[in-house]
Amino acid sequence: MVDFRKFYKENANVAYTVLGYPNLQTSEAFLQRLDQSPIDILELGVAYSDPIADGEIIADAAKIALDQGVDIHSVFELLARIKTKKALVFMVYYNLIFSYGLEKFVKKAKSLGICALIVPELSFEESDDLIKECERYNIALITLVSVTTPKERVKKLVKHAKGFIYLLASIGITGTKSVEEAILQDKVKEIRSFTNLPIFVGFGIQNNQDVKRMRKVADGVIVGTSIVKCFKQGNLDIIMKDIEEIFKK
């Protein structure tokens, strides 16, 4: 199983993008320049018609991608043309994986250099079949923990976790306000008592100020909505500068 610590030094810069937004050409050009960016780990969002975990900005970006005909097949074709030293993670809804076929999807993802899957609406209790395939192909199925998750459940969730722990720093959908820092610190401490895996904080982290604050709390910071916003105007040089600004030390 991949050790995500090898992709960063002190703290991981984790970004999220919707593949196909504003179009596949921009996504491909961005991925070709990924190694020149401060991003250590990139979550690749696969557009889905019913994105229950996503806020308005990400949901709108997914709709634009879908309206242009972006699907899992065009995503796979795009990734087959990409070479990068950075870690690539799929953020994908379970229905897409299920429709494609669990083993077929995981095997294909592995062949394209994907290190891990984040499946936001898949509960721990329903994840056995996908875990089996991920273990077979040495891909991490990422465990999500919320600040509101009770301690006993945290223990259960992280016991067999792989890759990293995704700590949800806000309650609800993406792009909302982050919870108090002290609450997060307590949650990180609690999670650390059960696992040695790195803990990355996401949901509600919007700017460089937030990033700097969260670096003191966890092993890495995940920025989603603000990164997706960078892509709206479509100019790659501006996108790269905006991303530099979000993750600057």
Curated annotation (Swiss-Prot):
Superkingdom of source: Bacteria
What Gene3D superfamilies does the database record attribute to this sequence? Aldolase class I
Active site (UniProt)? E43 (proton acceptor), D54 (proton acceptor)
What molecular functions are annotated in GO for this chain? tryptophan synthase activity
> Which InterPro entries has this protein been placed in?
Aldolase_TIM (IPR013785), RibuloseP-bd_barrel (IPR011060), Trp_synthase_alpha_AS (IPR018204), Trp_synthase_suA (IPR002028)
Q: What class of enzyme is it?
A: lyase
Q: Which UniProt keywords apply?
A: Amino-acid biosynthesis, Aromatic amino acid biosynthesis, Lyase, Tryptophan biosynthesis
Q: How does it assemble?
A: Tetramer of two alpha and two beta chains.
Q: Which HAMAP family match?
A: Trp_synth_alpha
Q: What is this protein called?
A: Tryptophan synthase alpha chain
